[in-house]
Amino acid sequence: MSKPLIISFASKGRDNYLEASENVYLSVKDHWQYDYLFYTMDGNRNEFAGMKLTQITELPQPSTWTCNPHSVTPYQFKFGLIDHAREMGYDKIIWLDSSITLNKCPLKLLEQSNKGVMCFHNLGFETKDYISPECLAILSHKGYLQSNNPPQVWGGCIGFDFTKYSAKRIFDTIAIMSELGAFDNSPTFKNHRHDQAVMSMLFNYYDVLPYNYGHIVTNEHHENKEYGNYYTFVYGRNYRQA
């Protein structure tokens, strides 16, 4: 039997992600009937609105590789937490950043994805403007560079259906690229988008088809319904005021 999971992580960080994540918790409570893992660091609560929060002081680690803290390898923690959850037996895993809320259950969207990878076109942003030369060199050396400007995908909302071999292979490649330095900050290129840039390149290589904008929308388009009302995710929504 399938074991779906939504996973998220929050800390005080650059902004107060602990507070922003309350919107995530409320939307998951309303639109998700399966398991969830809400990790928090440097917070002081074990629950919010009846939703369990898992307090940690250091990142849970997958058994086959070491996940560095964000200060060492930016955003690698997302994939470490996903892989750790995979080892716990979860096989359909959706990652939500603290800026993303649900508008309806996303499981079907993940299950219908062409390679077992649910991702979304980040409309209006081009990958070539947000990827460092060091990252391009790593991807090229490993043979994953098919285009310098494939469609950019959202980094804050991603899903992997590990019941499909293609999703396992793609996820493992992302993790390997993070270990090789493709996520790292560049000393000369300040706009590198770390995991988002790497995923955009690898998804293009593996023929992953991103869902069009409209399956995920910004809060502005949630309010004015310019892209209709069939969307599953909303970026930047204050769910508490919905």
Model-found features: residue ranges?
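Short acidic (Asp/Glu) patches
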Residues: 75-80, 131-145
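A glycosyltransferase accessory/donor-loop signature
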Residues: 1-2, 8, 18, 102, ...
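GT-A fold catalytic core of metal-dependent nucleotide-sugar glycosyltransferases
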Residues: 78-133
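Short amphipathic alpha-helical face segments that pack within enzyme cores
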Residues: 23, 81, 197-201
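A structural signal for short, well-ordered beta-strand segments and their strand-loop junctions
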Residues: 37-40, 93-97, 102, 118-120, ...
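Short catalytic/ligand-binding loop motif for oxyanion handling, primarily in non-cytosolic enzymes
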Residues: 16, 45-48, 64-67, 102-105, ...
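Short amphipathic alpha-helical segments and their helix-coil junctions
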Residues: 54-66, 137, 175-185
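N-terminal anchoring/stem segment of glycosyltransferases
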Residues: 1-67, 73, 87-91, 190-193, ...
